[in-house]
Structures are given as structure tokens and as C-alpha cells.
């Protein structure tokens, strides 16, 4: 199972755990639901793989790594705010950004324009090839 989906399962409580989270995200993609404003989901996926269908088929496999596309889908599905800390420089601070060495990316749900609509808020660490949940 991919570390991204395992990490998400620490915060997203879905029957079936990481596998169910992965499948729900793939269903979201397969239904061509929006990832970003202004671009069709199929077009975004075709930038990453030979075809839209190939991307989803491959992502359904437990050995396939997830990334920014899947994180954005999770935000949209579960109305989540997800912050990803880039810790490639070795600064492991579990989300406490007390210096400028920790770069972070904030993912927000596409339709939640007001903070009261966000139902879930969590942070992950990314080391360039691996995701871990931040446990504050």
C-alpha cells in the first residue's frame, strides 16, 4: 500500500482503511469530477499518463504511489485542508514551522471558500519519495 494513502488513513476514517481511501479517490477521478478550476480532470490526468483510463487503472493498484492529484481529490471529497511539509532538507519539525527551512504546500477543497466549510484539517510530511502523517 502506498505511504500517502496509509498516512491519510490516520486522519480520514473510512471503512476499509487506506485501500478504501485510494478507491474512493479513483472513483472521484473516474467520474471526471473537478480537481482544479479551469481544467478538465481528464486533461490533467493525460498530462501524467498515456491516457485518462491508464492513469486511473494504474492508481487503483496498491503498489502505485499517490501524489498531489490524489491529495487534492482527498481535499475535495472529505472537505479537508491538508498541509504537506517538504522535509527533504532534513528539517523534521512535525508541522511546527519556526524557521524558513520548512517549505509547505497547503491544499484546500475546491468548493470550500469559507473556513467553516472545512471538516478535516491535517498535515503530512513529504521527504521527496515518502509521506508520513504529522503527529503533533
Region spans (language model):
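Structured partner-binding subdomains within large eukaryotic complex subunits
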Residues: 101-136
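Papain-like cysteine protease catalytic cores
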Residues: 1-94, 101-104
Amino acid at each position: 500500500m502506498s505511504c500517502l494513502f496509509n498516512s491519510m488513513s490516520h486522519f480520514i476514517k473510512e471503512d476499509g482503511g487506506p485501500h478504501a481511501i485510494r478507491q474512493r479517490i479513483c472513483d472521484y477521478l473516474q467520474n471526471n469530477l473537478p480537481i482544479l478550476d479551469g481544467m478538465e480532470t481528464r486533461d490533467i490526468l493525460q498530462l501524467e499518463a498515456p491516457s485518462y483510463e491508464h492513469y486511473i487503472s494504474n492508481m487503483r493498484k496498491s503498489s502505485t504511489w499517490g501524489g498531489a492529484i490524489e491529495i487534492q481529490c482527498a481535499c475535495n471529497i472529505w472537505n479537508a485542508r491538508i498541509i504537506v511539509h517538504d522535509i527533504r532538507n532534513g528539517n523534521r519539525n512535525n508541522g511546527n514551522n519556526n524557521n524558513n527551512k520548512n517549505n509547505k504546500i497547503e491544499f484546500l477543497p475546491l468548493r470550500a471558500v469559507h473556513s467553516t466549510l472545512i471538516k478535516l484539517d491535517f498535515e503530512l510530511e513529504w521527504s521527496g519519495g515518502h509521506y508520513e502523517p504529522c503527529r503533533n
